């Protein structure tokens, strides 16, 4: 079961704020410029983000510019891994999934695969390398060949990530365990050396 849920919409932040005001729902403007609004309902927080298209990532962490979109496919295309690029149509009563990158199949096969070119995805945000490793250890999944190759040849991208973020991800990797193979031990060893 998910730790949290990400809600995405074609409504702009201004439209979401207006709907919240009309419905007397408390709002926390967490990331308006990135399209994210947090709604507080019955002591629960729900983050809702406008569909987005990203531009270049010149700092290796965040997009230079975020462009809002009205198309869920644009939003899913910017996700890191296929297993995180699945949407459930909340307006449908039939559990209708939007899964353009076969993330459900990758979950069934226990595979971690990037959306699109793995080198490009990791270059956009070096933290994705650590997230991939964390998912591997947490879920007991394996990497597809291209993702694994991109991880092993792009450790230098971690140089752009703060030590605090690296430490946080690394501790989560250790907590989740699943050191089941020589490859797992090699990944941990490589991380420690980096």
What are these regions (language model features)?
Residues 1-194:
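Catalytic cores of the polymerase beta-like nucleotidyltransferase superfamily
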């Amino acid at each position: 079961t998910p730790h949290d849920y990400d809600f995405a919409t074609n409504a702009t932040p201004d439209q979401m704020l207006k709907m919240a005001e009309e419905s007397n729902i408390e709002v926390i403007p967490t990331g308006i410029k990135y399209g994210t609004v947090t709604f507080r309902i019955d002591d629960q927080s729900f983050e809702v983000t406008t569909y987005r298209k990203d531009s270049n990532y010149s700092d290796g962490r965040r997009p230079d510019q975020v462009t809002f979109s009205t198309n869920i496919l644009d939003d899913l295309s910017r996700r890191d891994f296929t297993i995180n690029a699945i949407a459930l149509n909340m307006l449908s009563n039939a559990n209708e999934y939007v899964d353009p990158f076969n993330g459900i199949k990758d979950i069934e096969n226990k595979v971690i695969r990037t959306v699109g070119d793995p080198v490009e995805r990791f270059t956009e945000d070096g933290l994705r390398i650590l997230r991939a490793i964390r998912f591997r250890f947490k879920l007991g999944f394996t990497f597809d060949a291209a993702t694994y190759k991109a991880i092993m040849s792009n450790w230098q991208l971690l140089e752009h990530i703060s030590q605090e973020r690296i430490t946080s991800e690394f501790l989560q990797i250790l907590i989740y365990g699943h050191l089941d193979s020589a490859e797992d031990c090699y990944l941990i060893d490589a991380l420690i050396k980096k």
